[in-house]
């Protein structure tokens, strides 16, 4: 049986292969690629003989899936699978397993890093000190007593809710499924947007969530509110968000995800928006989280080989 790790998984190669060998059967043949490529022919060449492919967030389209004729199992080192041609996998009976839970703490950390940075003007303060300035014009807000709106209460959303409560925030939530968690008040999306001082997105990308936050939704938010997106880029209309920031419809935003994987083009509307903190899709990527993720990948593969698959999509 052949396993192809088709792109780097964020863990040192020697450590990654050691982790794989400690879990998987000794007779499995492992091929590791230490570069990311995007062209279909090269991806097919890498995966053509594989029974199992491990991939992170590298897009695998239907041509790649169908070009890997031996493929039986796809181990996705990511929570979302919107970058995978799932219809092609289903048509061929390929098992697809994801990694859930590895980045819960990491993503929540970045949410509050962004919230505090925006609320306390950390970037302008840093710039002021470096140009021999003072705090004039930079005194802003604290989180305590604010209303923190969470869209999507999966594991990450609930972690964010817990931390928000620790900061002394009132927590509102809007989600497809409601959880009976003390301190969280569920409401409709319109009420959440109108009432919240901070809005944090934690939804998967689906036909229903694509463009969930657009011009209408942004216009309903408080002028003093901030929006944080560590979920999926297309959940938010980027042009509408840039306009809302530049026109003062909302006060600030933290964005870790875009319509494309970084590098983000220099002419992207958000890169020229006022009071925006942008990060290159790093919310999930701490050293601890990437090791957890690799462990889940190999456990998923081992369980599939044994006939007891887990985390099947």
Descriptions of predicted regions:
Residues 43-46, 64-67, 191-192, 217-220, ...:
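Structural alpha-helical scaffold elements that stabilize or flank donor/cofactor-binding regions
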């Amino acid at each position: 049986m052949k396993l192809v790790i088709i792109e780097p998984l964020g863990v040192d190669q020697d450590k990654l292969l050691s982790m794989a060998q400690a879990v998987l059967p000794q007779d499995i043949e492992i091929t590791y690629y230490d570069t990311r490529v995007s062209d279909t022919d090269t991806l097919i060449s890498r995966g053509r003989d594989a029974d199992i492919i491990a991939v992170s967030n590298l897009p695998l389209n239907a041509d790649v899936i169908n070009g890997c004729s031996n493929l039986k199992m796809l181990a996705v080192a990511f929570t979302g699978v919107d970058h995978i041609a799932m219809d092609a996998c289903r048509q061929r009976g390929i098992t697809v397993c994801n990694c859930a839970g590895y980045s819960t703490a990491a993503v929540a950390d970045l949410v509050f890093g962004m919230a505090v940075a925006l609320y306390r003007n950390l970037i302008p303060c840093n710039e002021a000190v470096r140009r021999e300035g003072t705090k004039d014009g930079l005194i802003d807000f604290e989180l305590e007593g604010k209303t923190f709106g969470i869209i999507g209460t999966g594991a990450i959303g609930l972690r964010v809710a817990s931390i928000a409560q620790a900061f002394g925030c009132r927590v509102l939530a809007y989600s497809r499924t409601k959880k009976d968690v003390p301190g969280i008040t569920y409401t409709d999306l319109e009420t959440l947007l109108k009432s919240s001082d901070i809005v944090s997105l934690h939804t998967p990308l689906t036909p229903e969530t694509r463009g969930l936050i657009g011009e209408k939704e942004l216009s309903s938010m408080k002028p003093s509110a901030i929006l944080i997106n560590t979920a999926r880029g297309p959940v938010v209309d980027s042009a509408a968000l840039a306009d809302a920031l530049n026109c003062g419809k909302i006060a600030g935003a933290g964005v870790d995800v875009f319509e494309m994987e970084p590098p983000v083009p220099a002419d992207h509307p958000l890169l020229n928006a006022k009071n925006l903190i942008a990060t290159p899709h790093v919310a999930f990527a701490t050293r601890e989280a990437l090791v957890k993720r690799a462990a889940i990948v190999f456990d998923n593969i081992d369980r599939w080989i044994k006939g007891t698959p887990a985390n099947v999509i």
